[in-house]
Amino acid sequence: MAEKQKRLEEKIGKVPEIFKELEKTDPDLYGKVMGLDQMIWADGALSKQTKKIIAIAIAAALRDGHAVRAQMAGAGELGVKKEEIEEGLRVAFLLAGMPAYVCGKAALEEILGDRPRR
């Protein structure tokens, strides 16, 4: 597995099939996408943790359960608190409605429900 894919697997728990395929079929685009991924998730004006909360809220607003779960797993690895994710989901609810909140809330309980509060 390429070094970039190892880092991705460490961040989100697995390498999405699309990345494996892209590396084979279009290595140039793959390199650019992975570079963009590293740049976006790096600490900057916003912390990685804050970016994960934003990503969870966006995925919930899109009602993409797979993306919500993947981002939540990454958030858990970064030490994001359940209460912080809950606040992000409330923003999604305000802007995208109840279905977005329900999507995110279900994943929150599944992924981080039994996790002790910090």
Predicted regions and their residues:
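Acidic, glycine/proline-rich low-complexity segments that act as flexible tails and inter-domain linkers
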Residues: M1-T50, C103-R118
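Non-catalytic, well-ordered alpha-helical scaffold segments
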Residues: P16, K51-A55, E86
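Amphipathic alpha-helical segments within well-ordered protein domains
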Residues: D37-Q38, A55, M72-G76, L89-R90, ...
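C-terminal structural segments of small proteins and small subunits
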Residues: E86-E109
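Amphipathic, charged-and-aliphatic alpha-helical interface segments
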Residues: K51-G65
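Short alpha-helical linear motifs
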Residues: A73-V80, A96, A107-P116
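Mid-chain, well-packed structural core segment of small domains
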Residues: A61-L89
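Residues at alpha-helix boundaries and short interhelical turns
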Residues: E23, G44, L62-G65, G79, ...
